[in-house]
Each structure stands twice: as structure tokens, then as C-alpha cells.
Amino acid sequence: MCSPTNFLYEPFSSDAVTQNYDQNLKCTKCGAYYSMACSLREQNVWTCLFCNQSNSNAELPLVPSNTYTLTSAKKEILSRRTIMIIDAICDPHELNYLVSILCNNYITRQQEPLSIITIQQSGHVILHNAVNHRRDAVFSINEFMTKYNLDKLNASYFEKKISEINQESYWFDKSTQGSLRKLLREICKIANKVNISSKRDKRCTGLALFVSSVLASQCSLSAYCHIVSFLNGPCTKGGGKVMSRERGESMRQNHHFESKSSQLQLSKSPTKFYKKMLEKFANQSLIYEFFIASLDQIGILEMSPLITSSMAVSQFDSFNDERFAMSFQKYLNLRDHNAIYNCHSKIMTAKNAIVVKDFPKYSLNPKNLSLPLEISLGHNSAEAPIQFQTTFENQTEKYIRIETLLLPKANRSFGAQNEIVFSMKKIASRIIDSFAYSSKHTKELMKQLFLLPNQIRGKDVDMVNLIQWCYHIYRSPILSVRNTSPDERYLFLHRIINASKDTCLSLCKPFIWSYSDLKHDWIVLDVPLTRAQILQDDKTTICVDGGSYLVLRRGKLLEKEGRELCCKLLNDLQRFPQPLYVETKTGGSQDRFLKSKIIPLDITDKETLGTEDMTFNEYFNLFTDLSGSK
């Protein structure tokens, strides 16, 4: 039997020529649509690619295209609301900066209803009233009924308390912007400094997220609600708790997944809580997004049921960080101009196809969407047609996009990079979907990675190059926990799932930009990160783009030009979440960060870097031994 073809469908990756279609372009027998590959038997008569039915049409498309789009204008603009959860357990100076960003960037452009919820140090969660703050809805984790109903996810208890006052009074609009600014300033005034005590603060993140979901559920089913959380630490009380209040107890680490430790059990409980919470509001169009002012873990791994995209989480050292201001501005621009909702894609014509991971319904940046498919195409011809239908909407219109592609047969190769990206997405999906982060499960996936080169033998693929890419996957947080916390690894896996092909490759094997005197421009070098380029050369300035980070290694030459290139890459709207930016020089304090990203190719590299990692030579020998034993 012919092995399936691995394919990545990226419907929004480029601005391809599209045109509106009409029903005359639809096959009368199977329902497939006309494409450029359809043969013309005579004038205005075309043969369907999928069933060979002859179809007549008075006017065939004038613009040659395989992509057709049906656009329907909506009767009303997309109904959208926003709930902001502000963690007030924060340094006052930092909270002031967050509030100034919200006032200057969001409130000035506010077009939709906004609600404010704060997480207080005392274990209180406050839903603020837009008309009279004395009528705020206050929920305390210290009250038995609140904690009991939260654990039971009893929404009616919270609905009753919210509905004691007209629930619309909890929403700020353009007419109440003055009250909103006043409220935000008041939140800063009453926020206490970090509490120095024997226990951690009562931070009830789960309670705040549940209250916000209940409030959003009382709106129209057709309304989309963004629940945007600005967090400063992990949940320590109530549903969603990921860390003990005892300062001697730490959050779970990678090694806790190897045993039935108390930290691991504490990790599973909030995951179950958020999973049930998501199921409870499944009929609502709720979108959870997080801005986190802490590079430490706060429980993103446990919140995984709420996170549908890597773009839903942005993490910084603090809200004072310039990267936060830039990232939040990008977020607003993408949400207003690029985001799509209610996205679904299906294969109209291929029966033997398996979707590895569906598109998320909401995408902040659809150009990154990639649908990995395993398609059995058979043996008959050199090429096989396949047709996709993707439906989505933005703030003003609804779309149906039909796209026809010709796929090469399984005995022809897409190239090593396509196979690698597909494998990355497949492995990442399996880890996230099964919540399996133990080394035992990792070893099972490692075996699949070793088998990949053997599975595509006979194809036109550079096998050594393919094995090198497999080694990069082995060294990445997909399969390695080296220098990576559970939260960081989870976000990395989500980036892989939601990233375009090029971004996936940079996450796996960083791009190295260097200036070419021949081309008078910056180019990507096809060389590995080795000691020759990174650890010894102190003359040449290079830029290392690892997808989630950007490192400028300053040399004696072209330092200014290198910084300009980095600024250009950082300011690209499509780079979201905002990459971490690091500048270093030979022997500089940030050299350790860059060295942690370097793979040891041989024993000399291993000794220079002081790492226990398997070198590429060792990996290649292991692969050769395993292949020879089969």
C-alpha cells in the first residue's frame, strides 16, 4: 500500500489572486469547483478534475486562479465585547505603567463594551460597576458558598449575584470613558505594595476567569467576548490553584512528571478545573488571552484548556518592559485589522485524509495558520487534485474560500523541510492533547523521530540533511527539557502547532543573518550554529533569529546596521508574540543565552559549551545503529 502524503495547507500565507465565484463554476455532479487545471473540451465546456463530468458555462473566469472567494456582507458589524482581568497584586509603579498603557492605547480607540475585573490581595475578585462603584459585585474566596460553588462550577450562583443589578451596568462604553479612566486610577491607589509575610498572597485567578465567563455568557450567543487577563503571578487559592501559599513549597518542575508527586497532583487538578469550565461555556464564543508580567511560571500549562493559540499568551519581565507596550499595541492592531473568527476548513474532495490538528476558530494572525494533513492519494497518476473549503468572518464580512491544489503522489517528495515541519506539528499535537510530559512518553516520540528518515527512503531527499533536522527537533523543547520550564515548553509546543512553515523552521533551527558584501544586503546563512561562527569570530556582527527570540551578536563591524536589521524584524506586525530581544558581544553577560541555543556538533563543541547533550555525531551514529538493526 502506498504511504500517505504529508501536506501543510496554509490558506492565508500569501495574498494570492482570488476572485468571486458563482454557481456556474460548480460541477453539476460532485459539487467541486472549476480550477485552472480543468481541461476545456470545447469553448466554455470544462471537465471536472474529480469526477470527469462535462460542465457548460457561458462565461469562464477571466482571471486565471485556483482560488475563489464568496463574500457575503453581514447585516450588522460583528458583535464583540472585552473583559479585562487586572491582577492588582502588583508593585504600584508597575501597575501604574499598565494602567497608562491601557488608557493611552486601548481606551482612546475603544469602540466596544468593556468590563473590568480585578484580583485583590485579600482573596477578593471585584466586578466593577460602570455607574456606581458602591454597587460593585464582590466575590471572596474566603466565603464558603463562593468557594463551594466555584469548585462545583455552579454558574447560576454567580449569575444570581451579578443579576441583582442590571448586568449592562458592568459594561463601560464610549460615553463612560471618563468613569473608566477614574476607575483605573483608583485601582492603582488602593493597590498595596507586595505583602511581606510568611505566606504568599491569595491570588484567585480561577475565580476571576470563571466570573468573567459567567458575565460573558449573559450576552448574546452571537457576540464574541475577549477575556484579556493581565497577570503578575500564579493562582494560590480556589479553583485553578497551581501553587501553595507556603513559601517553602515551589511550583511543579519537569522532574515532577516522572512520579506521582504532590506537585504533579496539584498540577492535574487545575487542568481538570479549566477543562470543565471550558466545556460549561462551550456554546459561548469566549476567547481567553493573557499578558503576563513575570518570566517565572504562573501555571500556563494548567490553563492549557483555555488556550487555543500561542498568540493567546505574551510573557514579559514586567509591565514596565518596552516589549509589553510594543506587543500590546501589535495585539490591538491585529485584533482590529487582521483577526478572523469562526474559522473552519474542510476537504471537499479527498476521502482518505486525516487532519492532524484543526484550525483554531479564532486567529489573531491568520497568515500563520497551517493545517497538517495525511492524505492517501493512490498510485494512478503523477499528480492528484484536492479541493479545500474554508469559512471565516471578520468584523464586517463573512467569507467562503474554495481552493484547488495539485498534490504530487506519495512516491515524490515535498522536501526535507516539509517533512520536518509536519513531524514537528504532529509530535507537538500529541504531547499537548494527551497532557503527556514525562520522559517515558518523550522516549516513545523519540523513536518515531528516529524512524522518520527510514519512512521516506527512496524519495528524492538529502538523507544527511534530514537527519540533521531530526537532531534539531531532538534538541528543541519539543523533546528536550534542557533550560526549559514546563510552562515554557508548553508555549513552545503551541507555537509549533500554530506557526507557519518558516516560523516552525526558525524555532527548530535558528536563522543566522549576516551581511553579504556581494549582494550588499543581509542574507540568511545556510550554516549551523557552531563555535567557528559564534564563539570565536569577534569581528562580524550577526543576528540570530530563533522565532521566539532575536539575538544581536555585536562584532567590530556593522554593529549599527545589525541593530537596524533587528529593529526591522522586531517591528514586523506579523511577529507576535513579540520576540525576546538580546544584545551581546564576545564574552558579554548575555553570551550564556546564545550558548544555550547552540547545538554541539562534535566533542570539541561539547567541551567548549560545557554541555552533557548528545552531539550530532553521536546522534548520527545512534541513528545508523538503529537502522542497521532493523
Curated annotation (Swiss-Prot):
Keyword field: Cytoplasm, GTPase activation, Nucleus
- InterPro entries recorded: Gelsolin-like_dom_sf, Sec23, Sec23/24_trunk_dom, vWFA_dom_sf, Znf_Sec23_Sec24_sf
Q: What happens when the gene is disrupted?
A: Leads to a significant growth defect in the temperature-sensitive SAR1-D32G mutant background.
Signal peptide (residue range) = none
An annotated GO cellular component? cytosol
GO biological process terms on file = COPII-coated vesicle cargo loading; intracellular protein transport
GO molecular function list: GTPase activator activity; zinc ion binding
Q: Where in the cell is it found?
A: Cytoplasm; Nucleus
Where mainly located? cytoplasm
Anything else known: Present with 450 molecules/cell in log phase SD medium.
- Provide the function of this protein: Acts as a GTPase-activating protein (GAP) for SAR1. Contrary to its SEC23 homolog, NEL1 does not associate with SEC24 and its homologs, nor does it associate with the COPII components, suggesting that it is unlikely that NEL1 functions as a structural component of the vesicle coat machinery. May function as a signaling molecule.
Q: Which family does it belong to?
A: Belongs to the SEC23/SEC24 family. SEC23 subfamily.
Question: This protein is called what?
Answer: GTPase-activating protein NEL1
Q: Which organism is it from?
A: Saccharomyces cerevisiae (strain ATCC 204508 / S288c) (Baker's yeast)
Q: What is the lineage of its organism?
A: Eukaryota, Fungi, Dikarya, Ascomycota, Saccharomycotina
